[in-house]
Regions:
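Acidic, Gly/Ser/Thr-rich repeat motifs that build Ca2+-stabilized beta-propeller blades
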Residues: 2, 18, 22, 36-215, ...
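Bacterial N-terminal signal peptides that target proteins for export
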Residues: 5-23
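Loop-centered beta-sheet repeat module
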Residues: 221-266
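Mobile, glycine-enriched helix-loop/loop "lid" segments at the mouths of ligand-binding/catalytic clefts
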Residues: 231, 280-305
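Acidic, glycine-rich loop-and-beta core segments that form the ion-binding/anion-interacting portion
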Residues: 252-274, 278-287
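Repeated scaffold domains used in trafficking and secretory/extracellular systems
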Residues: 363-366
Length: 401
């Protein structure tokens, strides 16, 4: 029996209750008027600019005893792991080296053999209602996966965005390997746009989720709403111990649409965020901080907001997933169609961001550490934004420095 979070009739408030079986959330409004789509269209610009460091103050760096990575890095494609994926979104690595990938529009989870690329469908996640940028989004393995075989998933339902967990039984036939979903958290506002969707277990074994404001900008500053936030909960869905706001899953607020979460070697959290028309952001996350949206987009001179450590024009980035490797954050760009390297010194960039693969593989959705100096990179060319090429979508294995 778990504490469930559910939306009452007023959509932008949350309340806590206990139930054996939680009821469905009240229908969320699809607010899209006057808002741009984050997934963007065709890339713009010549790709020569990297980012802007002008305007506003940055957070003080945390540098004690840390080495600075080289100003310039490198990326080498080692191999194509898999092809022919449809609207891939979330990615999780199994202990044996195989990968699980979610399909946003088909609402399925597929296992990809890490050596041969063979694909085996686990099954369809019930209750997913794909539309616009919504559908089956992020996935993550339980920190106790070796014993509980739980897969967590963030998805858009008919009434909200929510997080569920399912037992994965690989002994069952293909297509029937997912158990019935247990709802961990419900009541995250949904929309045609700005659904967030990235989930990841942190070094503290708590579950973190990046959410969007669903096109209703006022939700980002409302600490009683789950929209436009980074959330931190226990594996059972309770507000995690030590959260900055009492009895609340909210970890940070003032976000527009968070789709990337990663921790560095010092267990510091970073998040990527879609801007509206001007600046996309990479942020160093501190519990309880306000990241400014909708009052600020990118760096701001106004007090009270935590400024991004880097920002990009939206045609260069439209960032989704991020990963940490070799002293740098690696950020996948959708509209920007490039992989960004941001070398770090503490919680600041130590050199100008560096772009790779500009336009070569199209839209890039997810990047995940693959051990040592390697990454997995997932493309996103079958999501209706561009014309897919033969073999799309694909998973690449990279060697980075």
């Amino acid at each position: 029996m778990y504490d469930k979070w559910n939306l009452p009739r007023r959509r932008d408030k949350i309340v806590q209750r206990r139930a054996v079986t939680a009821v469905l959330a009240a229908a969320a409004l699809l607010l899209t008027a006057g808002c741009s789509s984050d997934d963007g269209g065709s890339p713009g610009g010549d790709g020569s600019a990297s980012s802007s460091r002008t305007n506003g103050q940055t957070s003080p760096p945390e540098r004690s005893g840390e080495q600075t990575p080289p100003a310039k890095g490198s990326v080498k494609v080692l191999r194509t792991v898999a092809t022919g994926l449809k609207t891939p979104w979330g990615l999780a690595a199994l202990p044996d080296g195989d990968l699980l990938v979610s399909s946003r529009d088909e609402a399925t989870i597929t296992r990809v053999d890490g050596k041969t690329g063979k694909k085996t469908e686990l099954g369809e996640v019930p209750g997913v209602s794909p539309a616009g940028e919504g559908g089956l989004l992020g996935i993550a393995l339980s920190p106790e996966y070796a014993s509980d075989h739980m897969i967590y998933a963030y998805f858009t339902s008919a009434s909200d965005n929510r997080i569920v967990r399912m037992i994965y039984d690989e002994k069952k036939p293909s297509g029937e390997q997912l158990g019935a979903p247990d709802t961990v958290l419900r009541g995250i506002p949904k929309g045609v746009i700005h659904n967030g969707g990235r989930i990841a277990f942190g070094p503290d074994k708590m579950l973190y989720a990046g959410t969007g404001e669903s096109g209703d900008t006022g939700l980002s500053q409302d600490k009683e709403s789950l929209g436009g936030k980074i959330l931190r909960i226990t594996p059972e869905g309770e507000p995690a111990p030590g959260n900055p706001f009492p009895d609340s899953p909210v970890y940070s607020y003032g976000h527009r649409n968070v789709q990337g979460l990663a921790w560095d070697s010092k267990q510091r959290l970073f998040a990527s965020e879609f801007g509206q028309n001007t600046w996309d952001e990479l942020n160093a996350i501190k519990p309880g901080d306000n990241y400014g949206w909708p009052e600020a987009e990118g760096r701001s001179d106004e007090g009270g907001f935590h400024n991004p450590l880097e920002q990009w024009s939206t045609d260069e980035a439209s960032p989704s997933g991020i990963a940490y490797a070799e002293g740098s954050i690696w950020m996948a760009g959708l509209r920007g169609q490039r992989l960004w390297r941001i070398p770090l010194k503490g919680t600041e960039a130590s050199a100008e961001p560096q772009a790779f693969f500009e336009g070569k593989y199209g839209r890039l959705r997810t990047v995940l550490p693959a051990g040592e100096n390697r990454l997995w990179l997932v493309t996103s060319n079958t999501d209706g934004r561009v014309e897919p090429k033969d073999g799309d979508d694909r998973i690449l294995e990279l060697e980075v420095s």
